[in-house]
Amino acid sequence: MGQKSNPIGLRLGIVGTWDSLWYAGGGYASKLHEDLLLRSFVKKTFHHAAVSRVVIARKVDAVIINIHSARPGVIIGKKGTDIDRVKQKIAQMVNHDVELHIVEVKKPDLKAALIAENIAQQLEKRVSFRRAMKRGVQNCLKLGARGVKVSCSGRLGGAEIARTEWYKEGSVPLHTFRANIDYSCAEAKTIYGIVGVKVWVYVGDSRTGGE
């Protein structure tokens, strides 16, 4: 069933860890809902800052948010004004003290979330889906990925009937638990309707230090 399950969720505890690092004895549902709202808020606020991951941890009286971004300067703003404003808004949302940490993504072309967003943006600008997929895959392989797979689903090129197109280079072993596979999806809102973009990136095995 490796083909049908989310590669990240399937490997939690083997390769990688959770995006929500906290334990709740009670009120779990409200905290989980709060996490979903915070992630959505951060990604909408910094949609132009290439945010690949938002990790949320909790103390008794504080919420710690680590934002992984390829453009940390865009988030921080001039003299930290932008990040301070966002910090205040989040503090009002959660009624707790908030710590915001920015983690720079040094190789954005290796992150599935950023590749998917980039392809979706190109599709919205009417770039050919084949060209967008091929460019994303080749840029990723140049940075050392061992395999990349991309799929686009919808009314591709304005076709009457929706279909799914795939582009793959290298190997993406979805059934191997030790394989470090990054996965993400994005939506392109085109004039013909929504096109779904999915990206799998295989960087290496965890036992060989693949990151």
UniProtKB/Swiss-Prot annotation:
Stored Pfam families: KH_2, Ribosomal_S3_C
GO BP field: translation
Keywords (A to Z) from UniProt: Ribonucleoprotein, Ribosomal protein, RNA-binding, rRNA-binding
Keyword Ribonucleoprotein carried by entry: yes
Matches recorded under HAMAP family: Ribosomal_uS3_B
Function: Binds the lower part of the 30S subunit head. Binds mRNA in the 70S ribosome, positioning it for translation.
Family as reported in the entry's similarity comment: Belongs to the universal ribosomal protein uS3 family.
NCBIfam families: rpsC_bact
Protein's UniProt name: Small ribosomal subunit protein uS3
Organism whose genome encodes this protein: Anaplasma marginale (strain Florida)
Source species taxonomy: Bacteria, Pseudomonadati, Pseudomonadota, Alphaproteobacteria, Rickettsiales
